[in-house]
A protein has these predicted regions:
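Short amphipathic alpha-helix that is part of the acyltransferase structural core
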Residues: 1-68, 75-78, 82, 147-188, ...
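GNAT/GCN5-related N-acetyltransferase fold signature
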Residues: 54, 66, 88, 204, ...
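A glycine-centered beta-loop-beta connector
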Residues: 55-59, 205-210, 359
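Conserved acetyl-CoA-binding loop-helix of GNAT-fold acetyltransferases
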Residues: 85-88, 94-107, 233-247
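Conserved GNAT acetyl-CoA-binding A-motif
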Residues: 102, 107-121, 249-260
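Conserved active-site tyrosine of GNAT-family acetyltransferases
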Residues: 126-127, 131
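Active-site/acyl-donor-binding loops of N-acyltransferases
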Residues: 132-149, 232-236, 240-380
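Amide-forming acyltransferase catalytic core, primarily the GNAT-like/NAT-type
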Residues: 136-238, 243-244, 256, 289-308
Length: 380
């Protein structure tokens, strides 16, 4: 078996066929994943270089991609290696292919300078090599009863599929950037997140107001609508658009996923039949010192609430990493945790005072954790 290596542009068709075989065996068509994730998979050298491929006797048997994801974390941006498309040939599972690819991806991400890695996957599958549940998202259930049935005024609104002129692109980009926690998007790539086979984006312009919504269906298909993956613009117009689309498409329930953004939560809580809060994905700390240095402005600002001085020395027991956050004169407090518990301290779902009660890390409650969130349109 060959060692994992970066894919070349000429391998685009082979890579797309392979990951379709692994991830979309029941769906018809060609280059299915390319259509569902056009912002990730493209035949140019830059995007193909993100894929690690593993061959055995000339046959592609494994794939893993590392995509750069800029995480907005309350005023700073930390770039993470977003791991996706982890695939072993169905007939070759249990041969160590995934293990080899994950090890190669770690080397690759460290070489690129990513202090973090993120992925979506099973905790038992990925936890053994350092990833842990992290981040925070709220999923709201919207029904015609909770949201209110579409009125004549709602049904009269001029909805249309989102158009991609330069002004609309800049407007949507600016609206999303108002959220303090999320993922960085470039203007050049923005369109690829919205125009994909797995979702449909709608806009409405009415009496000087503007709003957009993005909906999707099951199994990475656009229909039937079951998810509200993103929205922005005039709040009342957003809800009216959702009511119209639910009525026209006979939708009885929508799941709406949002991050830790007050206006989004305030908009959906009153019109939801229920909601639940859960970890947003899995996180691994690759470089603790770089992470602490990049987060320092936010951590110092949040630390002022604790009314304490001195410095904090973070230590990761498994990997032996250390980092110091200097907060002023005074003693050094040492917080030593396992690698996965350090993820929980920095990005976990629950307050540090609850998870680490009776331990030094509990004193950082209020400064940590940070509510990391990757919007659905930015998943890898």
């Amino acid at each position: 078996m060959d060692a994992p290596r970066n894919a070349a542009p000429g391998e685009f068709a082979a890579v797309m066929d392979f990951i379709d075989q692994v991830f979309r065996p029941g769906q018809t068509g060609t280059r299915i994943m390319h259509g569902q994730y056009p912002h990730l998979y493209r035949p140019d050298a830059e995007h193909m270089g993100r894929s690690l491929v593993l061959y055995d006797a000339g046959t592609l048997v494994g794939h893993l991609a590392v995509h750069p994801v800029g995480l907005r974390l309350g005023g700073v941006t930390v770039w993470a290696g977003g791991v996706g498309g982890v695939a072993a040939h169905p007939d070759r599972r249990g041969e160590g292919i995934m293990t080899a690819l994950l090890a190669a991806s770690e080397t690759h991400m460290r070489a690129l300078g990513f202090p973090l890695s993120i992925l979506g996957g099973d905790r038992q599958r990925y936890g053994w090599c350092g990833w842990e549940n992290g981040g925070r998202r709220t999923t709201f259930a919207l029904t015609p009863r909770s949201l209110g049935r579409a009125t004549a005024a709602d049904l009269a609104l001029p909805l249309r599929r989102l158009r991609w002129d330069a002004a609309t692109r800049r407007r949507i980009w600016a609206l999303e950037r108002q959220r303090p926690y999320g993922a960085e998007r470039s203007l050049d790539d923005l369109r690829y997140r919205f125009e994909r086979t797995s979702r449909e984006a709608w806009e409405c312009r009415d009496a000087g107001r503007f709003a957009y919504v993005v909906l999707g269906g099951p199994a990475h298909q656009a229909h039937p609508y079951e998810r509200l993956d993103e929205f922005g613009g005039d709040p009342a117009l957003v809800l009216a658009m959702v009511r119209q689309l639910m009525a026209q498409h006979e939708v009885t329930s929508l799941r709406a996923v949002v991050g830790p953004h007050g206006p989004d939560l305030a908009l959906l809580r009153p019109v939801a039949s229920s909601w639940h809060v859960e970890a947003d994905g899995m996180v691994r700390i690759l470089d603790l010192a770089t992470l602490v240095a990049q987060l320092a402005p936010v951590l110092r600002r949040r630390h002022r609430r604790l009314r304490e001085s001195g410095s904090i020395e973070f230590g990761m027991a498994d990997s032996g990493q250390r980092a110091i956050l200097r907060l002023g004169p005074g003693s050094v407090r040492r917080v030593r945790l396992s690698d996965r518990d350090m993820v929980t301290l920095f990005f976990g779902l629950h307050p540090a005072g609850e998870v680490f009660a009776g331990r030094p890390a509990a004193r950082l409650d209020g400064m940590l954790p940070l509510p990391l969130f990757v919007p659905p349109l930015d998943h890898v």
